[in-house]
Amino acid sequence: MALERTFSMIKPDATRRNLTGAITKMLEDAGLRVIASRRVWMSRREAEGFYAVHKDRPFFGELVEFMSSAPTIVQVLEGENAIARNREVMGATNPANAAEGTIRKVHALSIGENSVHGSDAPETAAQEIKYWFSDTEIVG
């Protein structure tokens, strides 16, 4: 099976609580390798652009506010079936429904402050990676 790349983000609720290392370790322990990583404090404009797919949803304003409230860690992960593997280790969006041992079950505070984001398909992974990284910043 070929290696796959995906986008991952450690959200403000987790960076505020100094969970970057713990979450990255969980990703690496699941067989994912960090091949690009950067700490960013999103502007409102960057958050609106990144989450543009949700612009007509009722939670959009709150999402933008939250994502621009503190630093995030944006990452490119690589591994076998990286998209599915990342989503599995993240757990369900609602931490109450997340499986034991997943990032969201262990670290999330709520459905809104759920610690991590991960791409859901190859197309979104490519778009999300390109939003934050140039090709020269990704070192496999």
Curated annotation (Swiss-Prot):
Major role in the synthesis of nucleoside triphosphates other than ATP. The ATP gamma phosphate is transferred to the NDP beta phosphate via a ping-pong mechanism, using a phosphorylated active-site intermediate. PANTHER family: NUCLEOSIDE DIPHOSPHATE KINASE (PTHR46161), NUCLEOSIDE DIPHOSPHATE KINASE DDB_G0292928-RELATED (PTHR46161:SF3). Homotetramer. One of its GO terms (biological process) is UTP biosynthetic process. InterPro entries: NDK-like_dom (IPR034907), NDK-like_dom_sf (IPR036850), Nucleoside_diP_kinase (IPR001564), Nucleoside_diP_kinase_AS (IPR023005). One of its GO terms (molecular function) is nucleoside diphosphate kinase activity. Belongs to the NDK family. Pfam families: NDK. This is Nucleoside diphosphate kinase. It comes from the Bacteria. NCBIfam families: PRK00668.1. It catalyses: a 2'-deoxyribonucleoside 5'-diphosphate + ATP = a 2'-deoxyribonucleoside 5'-triphosphate + ADP; a ribonucleoside 5'-diphosphate + ATP = a ribonucleoside 5'-triphosphate + ADP. The active site is at 117 (pros-phosphohistidine intermediate).
